[in-house]
A protein has these predicted regions:
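A compositional/biophysical signature of low hydrophobicity enriched in polar/charged and small residues
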Residues: 1-160
Length: 160
């Protein structure tokens, strides 16, 4: 387990101010050039490239394209709370294998697992719930929270 003791979280990465500024630059515009970032943070283009490579290789950050589901024809998003009678880790893996599921987290509280789904419409959501999710062995019950309007979605917690 990467040298960590069972049950203990990994040590958080120690980022210096320059690395944090590089991350902030990429969060503002993931296509910003290394030369532009270098000017903003006081490093050469090569130094920025090396730092970005180190940050991505270590898993501290990733640079990805984020799409708008509605622009792609997926008009129904929902969070599904799942109560389980089976090993939640196994159930989470099964949920993660479903194409319409884009987020799975084990939780403490009312639900054992939360899974976010993205569907074209309500009919697809209903089919997903009835034919796939509720049919998984160990699912006791589900509660679906349909999204009406997204008010905030940011990915900038990494430099606080």
């Amino acid at each position: 387990m990467n040298g960590q003791r069972r049950g203990h979280p990994p040590k958080p990465a120690q980022l210096d101010d320059v690395s944090k500024k590089i991350i902030e630059q990429l969060q503002a515009d993931g296509r910003r050039s290394y030369a532009e970032i270098g000017k903003a943070v006081g490093l050469s283009e090569a130094a920025v490239r090396q730092r970005v490579q180190k940050l991505t290789d270590s898993g501290v950050m990733q640079v990805v394209a984020v799409t708008d589901p509605m622009q792609l024809g997926f008009f129904r998003q929902a969070m599904i709370g799942i109560r389980a009678s089976a090993d939640t880790r196994v159930l989470a893996e099964q949920l993660a294998a479903i194409d319409a599921v884009d987020y799975v987290v084990l939780t403490a509280g009312t639900f054992d697992i939360l899974a976010e789904v993205v569907c074209e419409d309500d009919d697809e959501l209903l089919e997903l719930l009835n034919s796939k999710i509720r049919n998984l062995e160990g699912v006791l019950s589900t509660e679906t929270f349909v999204y009406l309007k997204l008010h905030k979605q940011f990915y900038n917690w990494g430099t606080r």
